[in-house]
Regions:
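Canonical P-loop GTPase G-domain recognition
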Residues: 195, 201-261
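Flexible active-site lid/hinge loop adjacent to a nucleotide/diphosphate
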Residues: 178-207
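Hydrophobic anchor at the beta1->P-loop junction of P-loop NTPases
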Residues: 56-58
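Alpha-helical scaffold elements adjacent to nucleotide-binding pockets in ATP/GTP-utilizing enzyme cores
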Residues: 100, 137, 162, 166, ...
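Nucleotide-state-sensitive switch-loop elements of NTP-binding domains
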Residues: 5-53, 64, 73-159, 166-169, ...
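Hydrophobic positions on the alpha1 helix immediately C-terminal to the Walker A/P-loop
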Residues: 69
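Long, well-ordered amphipathic alpha-helical subdomains in the mid-to-C-terminal portions
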Residues: 21-23, 236, 247-314
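Conserved phosphate/pyrophosphate-binding and hydrolysis machinery centered on Walker-type P-loop NTPases
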Residues: 14, 28, 32-36, 63, ...
Length: 314
């Protein structure tokens, strides 16, 4: 990727040019040192322009209909005058390190909506399945004037924890009768969820969905109270039939009013910023260590000694 002057990117972002925004995000995601230097300058410039959006994490097991929901939800939001950015984290092959990056094809309306910006990003081997630079991408999207940032996760492993640590509201999508094998994933993310939506509540599945709503609502009472003092909602929706979408937004608005009034919203944002500072610091320290003179060769020697049982791995 051939780079340009800093002002090209910063002026483009402030002018809400999506092509230049995409180019800037590509620089942020790049592992090349020259790109990283320029990307940091772009982020530093955009930092004062960021922080004014609502960041919403959306997760759920594969097959729950996340992309269909985001298509319906995003269309509703732009319909009431909001500008939204969708950061869709795609599953990545651990062997080929390739990515499907198919979210734009699954969000036909949003892909051509002038008030929506979709940025697929490979999850790679990053802890949690969330693109390593997702937090910086959020800042750039905010600087470009997007009022609502939707972060969709791969819905497996530790990805929910990562998204929870960079968003204001955490939305869990579920479907009725998903099977007992998913209970482990459900419990872990249910404790973080600010709202649970039972998707695909339509047709013959409506009765099952209502039963699931009762079960999840009962289960939530068993969890400790949230620090925000917010009581999570459990509601039904059908992204396919466009029902329950406006209600989902009303829940989020109620959450924002409550947490901004109590001061929790600002407190949580500052805590997230501090956490990400230390994550970045740890990453930089490790990177510097592995790039040190002769480190790779020394590690290989030590590794072989460990494998031979000559020294302890601890």
């Amino acid at each position: 990727m051939k780079t340009k002057e800093l002002s090209y990117y910063t002026n483009g972002i402030e002018a809400k040019n999506t092509v230049i925004l995409s180019q800037s995000i590509t620089l942020v995601e790049s592992s090349k040192k020259e790109h990283q230097v320029l990307a940091q300058q772009i982020i530093n410039h955009c930092l004062p322009l960021s922080g004014n959006s609502i960041r919403i994490g959306i997760t759920g097991v594969p097959g729950v209909g996340k992309s269909t929901f985001i298509e319906a939800f995003g269309t509703f939001l732009t319909g009431i005058g909001k500008k939204i950015a969708v950061l869709a984290i795609d599953p990545t092959s651990q062997q080929s390190r390739g990515s499907i990056l198919g979210d734009k094809t699954r969000m036909d309306n949003l892909a051509v909506n002038p008030d929506a910006y979709i940025r697929p990003s490979a999850s790679g081997k990053t802890l949690g399945g969330v693109g390593q630079k997702t937090h910086e991408t959020i800042l750039l999207c905010e600087a470009a004037g997007y009022e609502i940032i939707l972060v969709e996760t791969v819905g497996v492993g530790q990805s929910e924890t990562e998204v929870f640590s960079m968003t204001d509201f955490f939305l869990l999508l579920m479907i009725a009768g998903a099977g007992d094998e998913l209970q482990g994933i459900k419990r872990g993310i249910m404790e973080m969820a600010d709202a649970i939506l039972i998707n695909k509540a339509e047709g013959d599945n409506l009765i099952k969905a209502k039963q699931a709503r009762r079960e999840y609502a009962n289960a939530l009472h068993l969890f400790p109270a949230k620090e925000s003092d917010w009581i999570p909602h459990v509601e039904l929706c059908s992204a396919l039939q466009n029902t329950g979408i406006e209600e989902a937004w009303n829940i989020i608005e109620s959450y924002l009013v409550k947490t901004k009034t109590t001061g929790y919203f600002e407190k949580n944002r500052k805590r997230q910023t501090k956490d990400w500072f230390y994550k970045f610091l740890n990453h930089q320290v490790l990177t510097s260590f592995y790039e040190g003179n002769g480190i790779t060769e020394q590690l290989k020697e030590i590794e072989q000694q460990v494998l031979n049982g000559e020294i302890s791995p601890f």
